[in-house]
């Protein structure tokens, strides 16, 4: 084995020279240079500085403006809440531990940090699934008279939390476990060992199938159908400038959604899957740390893509920040007209 396994940790470094120490008790400078831990801390600080204001502002602006309290925006708010879970439950902890170069909070703190980071990430992921389904049902109209209402939004919210808990909670009760990963300053699911005493192999397979592959398939299917529907509508109305504009907006939005999802999650999932299927292989701590950077950055991507590109929300945000006046001069009528104009084919 090219790593060192302990009671509640796995360090990706051979202990042939006897230098490996518990990541809960000693700095891990044999894994990476001090400046690399400083870079990790600086990155976490950047995510906190950017992630907290934009997600908090999302919640605050929605509370301030009643017209934003629509069923679809419930899901967008759920994204903001999930991102705040990641900011406070994961990023702040990783910032502090990176400054010390080891996980100073012990196994209990590791369980809590791993749980909240996983919970926030999964809530965000399943929120994107609900958004994809909502867009598919509203735009493609597989059910002709269906209208996405408040009850459907509440059911969607419940689904995101149930599925997130179904992924984040089992390691706390003996099915798999949370251990320090990468540079040993943050915690995640144990992809590194089979750990038969906690049935780790079955949990990792379950997580990859139910909490990664299935969401990915749903998102691609829904947005693929969305693009086809919009193109078909445009083909039938060649002279409709409104439809042509909506086609471009939806296509751009879909591309950004899919690319952001892939950038955020596929590198991390791919590396984790490789590590799990190549037990004992030789890899360094940076091998897992860098992909996790992209996954954590979803706390910034999500509000920018799903909310900041919404013209109505953007106008409300500017009005809130500028004490009741919109410096861009976009009046309510133009915002309403724009929203109505693309309501049948463009994202809300």
UniProtKB/Swiss-Prot annotation:
Instruction: PTM N6-(retinylidene)lysine: list the residues.
Output: 296
What GO biological process, any one, is recorded here?
A: visual perception
Q: What Gene Ontology terms describe what this protein does at the molecular function level?
A: 11-cis retinal binding; G protein-coupled photoreceptor activity; metal ion binding
Q: Which domain of life is it from?
A: Eukaryota
Where a lipid (S-palmitoyl cysteine) is covalently attached, the residues are 322-323
Site (Plays an important role in the conformation switch to the active conformation): residue numbering on this chain: 113
List of residues that carry Phosphothreonine: 335-336, 340, 342
Q: What is this protein called?
A: Rhodopsin
**The encoding gene:** RHO
């Amino acid at each position: 084995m090219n790593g060192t396994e302990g009671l509640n940790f796995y360090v990706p470094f051979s202990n042939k020279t006897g230098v490996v120490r518990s990541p809960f008790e000693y700095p891990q400078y044999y894994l990476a240079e001090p400046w690399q831990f400083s870079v990790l801390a600086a990155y976490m600080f950047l995510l906190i500085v950017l992630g907290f204001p934009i997600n908090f502002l999302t919640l605050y602006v929605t509370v301030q403006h009643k017209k934003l309290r629509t069923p679809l925006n419930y899901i967008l708010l759920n994204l903001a809440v999930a991102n705040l879970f990641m900011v406070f439950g994961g990023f702040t902890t990783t910032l502090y531990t990176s400054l010390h170069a080891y996980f100073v909070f012990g196994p209990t703190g590791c369980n809590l940090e791993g749980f909240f980071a996983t919970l926030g990430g999964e809530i965000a992921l399943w929120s994107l699934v609900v958004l994809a389904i909502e867009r598919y049902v509203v735009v493609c109209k597989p059910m002709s008279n269906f209208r996405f209402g408040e009850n459907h939004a509440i059911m969607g919210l419940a689904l995101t939390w149930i599925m997130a808990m179904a992924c984040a909670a089992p390691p706390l009760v003996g099915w798999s476990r949370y251990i320090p990963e990468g540079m040993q300053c943050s915690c995640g699911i144990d992809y590194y060992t089979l750990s038969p005493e906690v049935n780790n192999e079955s949990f990792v397979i379950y997580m990859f199938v139910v909490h990664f592959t299935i969401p990915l398939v749903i998102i691609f299917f829904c947005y693929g159908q969305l693009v086809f529907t919009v193109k078909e509508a445009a083909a039938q109305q060649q002279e409709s400038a409104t439809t042509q504009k909506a086609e471009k907006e939806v296509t751009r939005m879909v591309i950004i959604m899919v690319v952001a999802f892939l950038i955020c999650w596929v590198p991390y999932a791919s590396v984790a899957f490789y590590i799990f299927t190549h037990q004992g292989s030789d890899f360094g701590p940076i091998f897992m740390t860098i992909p996790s950077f992209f996954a954590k950055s979803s706390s910034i991507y999500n509000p920018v893509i799903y909310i900041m590109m919404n013209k109505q929300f953007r106008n409300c945000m500017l009005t809130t920040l500028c004490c009741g006046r919109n410096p861009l001069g976009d009046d309510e009528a133009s915002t309403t007209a724009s929203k109505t104009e693309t309501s049948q084919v463009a994202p809300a």
